[in-house]
Amino acid sequence: MTRVLVLYYSSYGHIETMAGAVAEGARSTGAEVTIKRVPETVPIEVADKAHFKLNQAAPVATVAELADYDAIIVGTGTRFGRMSSQMAVFLDQAGGLWARGALNGKVGGAFVSTGTQHGGQETTLFSIITNLMHFGMVIVGLPYSHQGQMSVDEIVGGAPYGATTVAGGDGSRQPSQIDLAGAFHQGEIVARTAAALVAARN
């Protein structure tokens, strides 16, 4: 059975919600799916004052376990057009896995959240994808078979590089059904691609 990890960092819950949809999409293929988050690096008292969502159900991941999965789909909110420092710190610790090629040939994908429509969605996706490519991973985005990203009738997330959502400057906008459908679709396609690669190797 194909093993998929949905690995995320979420300050306010938007990416946590998207991660659930990504996982549902991957599970729809019959894959074994695990959702985990990276450790919070902001001091708890500071995070609490900033109203971070600290009571998230997903367990905290370890770097060593990344090698146990056939696919890893990484999600985070943007920080000035790039991935959050929490996610960057976590991935930066994977040098040992990189050195021994432990992630070579595994499937990777990315999904993100920004405060505004033009707040760095694609550059944040690229910052994650670049990292995964250095690990030797095969990247799967969000193809236009997800028609929702073609809509101009409302604010929608989604790019060919990965699923996205727009949280609003004050965080009041939650992922829409179109955003969640994109996340589901990406999870499904990543899992199917990973299954095909595993079967080909066997």
UniProtKB/Swiss-Prot annotation:
UniProt-annotated binding residues for FMN: 10-15, 78-80, 113-119, 134
The keyword Electron transport appears for this protein: no
Required cofactor(s): FMN
Binding site for substrate: 98
Protein name: NAD(P)H dehydrogenase (quinone) 2
UniProt source species: Rhizobium meliloti (strain 1021)
PROSITE patterns in alphabetical order: FLAVODOXIN_LIKE
HAMAP family xref list: NQOR (MF_01017)
